[in-house]
Structures are given as C-alpha cells and as structure tokens.
Amino acid sequence: MSNSGIQIKEVKRKLIQGLSKRTQDVIVRRFGIGKKKKETLESIGHTYGITRERVRQIQNEGLKHLKTEENLSTIKPLFDDLELFISERGGLVREDVLLEDFIEYIDPEANKIKLRGFSLLLLRLNKNVRRAKENAKFYTLWYTQKKALDQARSLVSEVIKIFKKSKAPFQEEYIIAKLKKLFPFFSRQAIGSYIDSSRAIDHNIFGDLGLSEWPEINPRGVKDKAYLVVKKLGKPLHFRAIADEINKANFSKHIAKPQTVHNELIKDKRFVLVGRGLYALIEWGYERGTVKEVLANIFKKNKGKALSEEKLVELLLKKRFP
C-alpha cells in the first residue's frame, strides 16, 4: 500500500474541474473515468456532431492543460506512487494488471472499477513511464526503465525453455523459486511481473503455470477440460463425476453434460475405459482392452513365464481399475 495518504478521488476532482465542460466530457469518456470502459473517438464525435479528428484535438488540448505545472504539482504524489509501484515489480507491469492493482495499492477502500480510467490518465500524463504496445510475444506493458524490457525477455525465454523441457505445468511458486536461482538479483515480485508480461505463458483455472498453447493451461473443449480435472485429481473417475468436476471448476457458463463427456472421452486417445463408465489416463500406465486382452499383454511382456496368482492380480490392477 502507498504511504502518500493522498485522496485519489479528490485529486481527480481537482484536475477535471479545471477543464471546460465539453473537454471534461471528452477526457472522462475517452479514458473511461468512472465507467467500466472507455469510448471511441467516433462515438464521442457522434454525440457532438463533430469529426473523430476534432474529438482527438479536444482530447489533446485537455491533456496539454492537465500537464501544466500547477496540475502536475497536484498529482506528483500519485506519480511517485505509480513509479514506485512499477519499480517494485522490476520496472515493468502489464497494463491490465496495473490498472487492476494500482488503485488498491494506493487505497484498498477505493472503487477499482470506477478509478481504472483515472489510472490510465495518470499513465498518459507521467513522462517518466513509457508504454510498450502489445505484440505477438508480449502484452501491452508500462515500464520505467528500458532495461526492464530486456530483463523480461531474458527471463521469459528461460521460462519457456523450462516448460518445453518438462512438457508439464508447475505451481507458480516452484517456477519462481527456480528462476530466483538463475536470476538472483531479480525480486520475486519482478519475476512474477515478467512472467505475467508474456503471452506465451499463462495460468490455468487451478493456478498451475505453463505454456498458453497447452490444453492443460487453456482447455478448448470438453475433452481438454476432462483431461485437466482428471489429471488434477490423480485417479480414475466415472464420466458423471468428471462432468460434475468440470462444472464445479467453472471453466465457462456452458454446462458439461455427462453423456457428452462419455461420448468425447471414449474417442480420446489420452483416456482409457478401465471399468464400467470409469476413465483413467493412458499416461498413468492403464491399457485399453478387455481383461482377457490385458492379461495376454502381461504374459507377453513377461515372455510367457509362470506368474503367481498374487503377482498376476498385482500387475492386472496396474493396468485396470478394480
């Protein structure tokens, strides 16, 4: 939390009231101040019967007025907080994370939704922070030092290597601890912020971290969601229980139906039916086929040598669910 004790709503009021009514309206609507989202130049122009370019001119005139020495002195404590917030996170923060968390950092009691737009305005007015537009590899970012961009690229490259080698997601704390050894001068907050900046890395619904393209991270259908919940629970489940777990996880508003789950999993090579309606993962060592077929495979792998009844049952239970 900030130590400035400044009242962000009071600063917002003082800044905006110095503008003409139309300029106030343009700034408020363009930045979404007090609203859930910002408006386009076109929609604002339609209100006043003016062109998009004229709206842009009014916006720029308003921003120029807000950058006067008197106004900047009013918001300097907020600028200091903003720069400290970014600095504590390695000098770089993803835009949507910054807009979500900065207001709470200043004032935990403030309405984050209504003040998101004001945070965006502060970013535009502060000459000490820069914006990096989103691209194929990174989200839109705000940074205080250019070296932070290079540090983020270096760390993200290492994270991607770790995941490509492991071919499996990890809990974020494990990854951060591993990266702390590779980058000892980066704080844990900086490492987390750099990871968040990458489009190639994401969290799944259970908080595991992995490559965005993996179905375990961003499941795209019932089959992927089923795979994720069964793997997370670590045991074979009936298709009705799998449907229940998918719905409890709240992946989306769409309800998973038991019969749909059954129909999808019976065709999916990652799953094997190991009992009446029970599905397990092939990667756990279970085998497809009837009990007779599984027994035949066991004898084949043991080159036909005699096995005691106890050993046979033990090997069978590793391949089939009782």
Predicted regions and their residues:
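C-terminal non-catalytic scaffold/interaction domains in large multidomain proteins
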Residues: 1-322
